[in-house]
Amino acid sequence: MRRTLFVLFVVAFCFIGSVIANLSLPPGFSLRKRLPRSLVDILHLRHEQGLRDDTELRNWLSKQQPAMNKMFSSSSRENGSEKPVVSDVLPKNRAINIFASLTRQFEPIESRLNDSSKNITVLAPRNSAIQSLPRKPWENPEDYEKFGGVSAYEGQEGEDRAKQNLQRFVEAHIIPASPWREGEEMETLGGEKLKWIKKGDKIYIQPGNVEVDNIAETVINGELWILNSVLNYR
């Protein structure tokens, strides 16, 4: 009896297998072909666009990491023969190393940070604040409207526009004076007028009500403030 049931089971299994084989998709047939062509194209383009956007973001962020040779280079100030200046302490704070790297893109700004004879207040946004911007610091919506989304930053002229935008971003976060007193209106290197007020134990920069996380460093030529968001630079 058991042997008979086993034989019947084997026969049934073989029969079902042959049916499934006959219903198999022909070689080379893709389930993707069952989708309407227009939908396939849209999904494909969205996937490629997503990859491009992600790659662009990762590439941009990787370029903003501080140059290791600059970050750890020794000078007479590092050895204690001179007091440190803002340019010495700025790249050492990992929370703001994106902004620190941007300041090194422009020789006049870097020189000012390194000048012990001229006081300065650096308002450095945290990395997370820059990363959460709706657009890159070098992007300007007006450029896209005037030159188009594709060619706004292509070629030498496009690169120059991007560099100018980036410089404005950095200059909007630097005040050529220190100390900066509460309620005192000061003009940034970019020409914007700012002041700060204190609410409880928190400091807020106006306009924009930008919260100061902390005053990280006080050195011979000024102070380094860390911000929880970016200042208006347009």
UniProtKB/Swiss-Prot annotation:
GO terms for cellular component: vacuole. Keywords: Signal, Vacuole. Residues 83-231 form the FAS1 domain. Residues 1-21 form the signal peptide. It comes from the Eukaryota. Pfam families: Fasciclin. InterPro entries: FAS1_dom_sf (IPR036378), FAS1_domain (IPR000782), Mug57-like (IPR040200). It is found in: Vacuole. This is FAS1 domain-containing protein AFUA_8G05360. It comes from Aspergillus fumigatus (strain ATCC MYA-4609 / CBS 101355 / FGSC A1100 / Af293) (Neosartorya fumigata).
